[in-house]
Swiss-Prot record:
It comes from Brucella suis biovar 1 (strain 1330). It holds the Pfam family Thymidylate_kin. It is an enzyme of class 2 (transferase). GO terms for biological process: dTDP biosynthetic process; dTTP biosynthetic process; dUDP biosynthetic process. Its EC number is 2.7.4.9. Belongs to the thymidylate kinase family. This is Thymidylate kinase. Gene3D superfamilies: P-loop containing nucleotide triphosphate hydrolases (3.40.50.300). GO terms for cellular component: cytosol. InterPro entries: P-loop_NTPase, Thymidylate_kin-like_dom, Thymidylate_kin_CS, Thymidylate_kinase.
Length: 214
């Protein structure tokens, strides 16, 4: 795969979608045509599974079933969108990927790490991100932001969970970043959108320069 695969991770209300849009605009200004996608979803099959997961219909069957649904959606997403885009040399910006499964189903779902690693390996089949930006914000602040963004819409299955669960996921993302520093970069998301975007642009521009693309 010859493109660049960048994933954005973090808790609810961390500002991932906003920062993806800002980075995409920056990349377009430099002549790139980035692919913007999300998980769960990103391909027709994965979007169908997304509805089942976020509606809460899968929750009844427990975290193991939910993890398998995420893996099935991810496999289709990688096969139908991510891998072809990377083969074309495109830059792929993805809102959530493997680390969300590790944090949500693995850590707070109390699923065995070996089990999670096995289904992750099958789902991505080698399509690891080149860079993962972990947008870090305390759970209380993130949930407050998410609520304001949502307005009168109903909170999804994950937003409804206890704040202690959200904080545990935050710590899980930070631990992943500590364990994989070559791939992961923690970004302080409790700042203005502009300051966050500036740091992200700097990180990405450095990689593009190293690759001789900028």
């Amino acid at each position: 795969m010859s493109g660049l695969f960048i994933t954005f991770e973090g808790g609810e209300g961390a500002g991932k979608s906003t920062q993806i849009a800002l980075l995409a605009s920056h990349l377009r200004n430099h002549g790139f045509d980035p692919v913007i996608t999300r998980e769960p979803g990103g391909s027709p099959g994965a979007e169908a599974i997304r509805h089942v997961i976020l509606s809460g219909n899968a929750e009844t069957y427990g975290p193991a079933m939910e993890a398998l649904l995420f893996a099935a959606a991810r496999a289709d997403h990688v096969d139908q969108l991510i891998r072809p885009a990377l083969a074309e040399g495109r830059i792929v910006l993805c809102d959530r990927f493997i680390d969300s499964s590790r944090a949500y189903q693995g850590v707070t779902g109390n699923l065995d790490a070996t089990y999670m690693a096995a289904i992750e390996r099958i789902a991505i089949d080698g399509a690891m991100p080149d860079l993962t930006l972990v947008l870090d914000i305390c759970a209380e602040r993130g949930l407050s932001r998410a609520g304001k963004r949502r307005g009168s819409d109903t909170a999804d299955r994950f937003e409804k969970e206890d704040i202690a669960v959200h904080e545990a996921r935050r710590q899980a993302f930070l631990e992943i970043a500590r364990q994989e520093p070559a791939r992961c970069k923690v970004i302080d998301a409790d700042r203005s959108q502009e300051k966050i975007a500036d740091e992200i642009r700097s990180v990405v521009d450095t990689i593009l320069t190293e690759k001789g693309l900028l």
